[in-house]
Design a protein with these regions (language model features):
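Bacterial N-terminal signal peptides that target proteins for export
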Residues: 2-10
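Short, low-complexity, glycine-enriched hydrophobic/amphipathic alpha-helices that associate
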Residues: 24-81
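Amphipathic, membrane-active segments
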Residues: 75-106
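Structured segments of extracytoplasmic/periplasmic soluble domains
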Residues: 70, 74, 86-89, 94, ...
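Periplasmic peptidoglycan-binding/anchoring modules of Gram-negative envelope and division proteins
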Residues: 107-142, 169, 206-208, 213-225
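Extracytoplasmic/secreted proteins, especially bacterial periplasmic and envelope-associated proteins
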Residues: 33-38, 42, 63, 78, ...
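Periplasmic OmpA-like peptidoglycan-binding domain that tethers envelope proteins to the cell wall
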Residues: 143-217
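C-terminal motif of bacterial Sec signal peptides marking the signal peptidase cleavage site
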Residues: 18-22
Length: 225
């Protein structure tokens, strides 16, 4: 396991504490929630991995910090507010990016990797926001609980991540913006010790963060003061 320096460790404690406290207060009837968790610019992807969340790691690893990061963050604020209106979406503002989570039960049937009609509506709503804000990358992750074999769960999480990615492509999201990853049962949010916890672990996560064009534009704006 890689050792974290003091700055990384401090950021990890702050981030995980903020996210945990925010998530504990979620109301299942809410359409969405935005959780702020400023990360700082120099932390790196290792912090997210140490926290057991690679989507978080992708966002932190892409951070640039300083005035440039603040400009990017403000642009992400507006997108996150819109995304939080999508029913079933858990939306977290993390540093200079956005982490969106849908429980798999919201998107797929049991042991299935075909988006149901309601799920298609939700992902179309997400795609509409992403299309209005084209200067971002989108990482799509598939996760499962520990029911079934690890190999089955890994394959299922792969099919689900790719199903969402393909659907976004069909909504005119450029393929150059999309990246998929899948982890099966290896990255649970909570312990798989109850049906409600297992439902949380069966999920698709999105990490949305600035591309090079947005970073350069933010640098120019920051230089103007």
């Amino acid at each position: 396991m890689n050792k974290l320096n003091f700055k990384q460790l401090f950021a990890l404690v702050m981030i995980t504490g903020l996210v945990a406290s925010g998530c504990s207060s979620l109301n299942k009837t809410q359409k969405g929630v935005i959780i702020g968790a400023g990360a700082g610019g120099a932390v790196g992807a290792g912090v997210g991995k140490a926290a057991g969340n690679t989507a978080l790691g992708a966002i932190i690893g892409a951070a640039v910090g300083g005035a440039t990061g603040g400009i990017i963050g403000r642009k992400m604020d507006k997108q996150a507010e819109e995304m939080a209106k999508i029913p079933g979406a858990e939306v977290k503002r993390v540093g200079e990016g956005i982490n969106v989570t849908f429980e798999s039960g919201v998107l797929f049937g049991v042991d299935q990797a075909t988006l149901n009609s309601d799920a298609q509506t939700k992902i179309k709503d997400l795609a509409a926001i992403l299309n209005k804000n084209p200067d971002t990358y989108i990482l799509i992750e598939g996760h499962t609980d520990n029911s079934g074999t690890s190999s089955h769960n890994m394959a299922l999480s792969e099919r689900r991540a790719k199903a969402v990615s393909n659907f976004l492509s069909a909504q005119n999201i450029a393929s150059s913006r999309l990246k998929t990853a899948w982890y099966g049962e290896s990255q649970p949010k909570v312990a798989n010790d109850s049906e409600s916890n297992k439902a949380q672990n069966r999920r698709v996560e999105f990490a949305i963060y600035a591309n090079e064009k947005l970073v350069e534009e933010a640098k120019v704006e920051a230089a103007k003061g």
